[in-house]
Structure formats: C-alpha cells, structure tokens
Amino acid sequence: MPPKPKILTVGEILVDFVSTESGKTLQNAPAFLKCAGGAPANVAVGIARLGTESAYIGNVGDDSFGRFLVSEMNSAGVETSGIRFDPLHRTRLAFVSLKKDGDRDFAFWESDPADEHLEFGKINLDLLKRAHIITLGRSYF
C-alpha cells in the first residue's frame, strides 16, 4: 500500500515565466526564467519541503509544459499520481514581472487551459481517501 499523504492539494497548476530583472514591466523584461507555478501547486511543494507527505490533484496539458510541471513536482517530493494529462487542452502559461512599485504584473496565455477542466469523475479517488487534510485552490466541481 502506498504511503498515506497527510495533505492533498487540488487546483490550478501552470508554468510561470518570471522576468529575470525586477523593476521592469512585461513589455521591457529582457528575459524570463521558466518555473512551476499556480498557488495550489506551490502549496503542495511547500508542504513537501517542510517534510510533510504531500500529494497533488490537477490537470496539465499533454504537452512539454505539462511534463515539465510533473517532473518539477516529483523532484520536490510531491506525489503526482493525481495529475491527469489532458489531451484536449494545453497547459496554462503565465508571464510575470515585478514592477518598480513592488506589484506583480501578470499576462496569461491559453484561453481554455487544462487546469480548468478538472472533472470529479476523472480524479484519483484513492488520494482523497488517504488524505488527512485537503486544500482547494478554487472550486471546480
């Protein structure tokens, strides 16, 4: 039997392209660094880094960015058996910069991303049964 995840996170997951220079708008950013992102996915990684068993449920596109996200989550110690590769929708992308006033500037790419197509009937119910705590990024069902 697999180990019992203590905390299960459900929600959006995306690739952030973060400006390599702060104080620049997206228009003026010279380059971007590819990072795993999405608040619920970040929570799952943080839980794992604190040494607590962590699992994640969500959708990614069946594309290179989706595979990148699963690899990053695995590397962080998050159980990823709850991630579904959606063959019909792409992984969400976000471009992020930190403006001079300290506020973040976002631009999202993908009008109908995979993470918005999480269906209750297609999720890994075993993860739900094994979780002590479940956190939701937003309401999907």
Describe each region flagged by the PLM:
Residues 53-138:
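Conserved N-terminal subdomain of the carbohydrate kinase-like
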Residues 1-79, 118-120, 135:
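Glycine-rich phosphate/adenosyl-contacting loop at the front of the ribokinase-like
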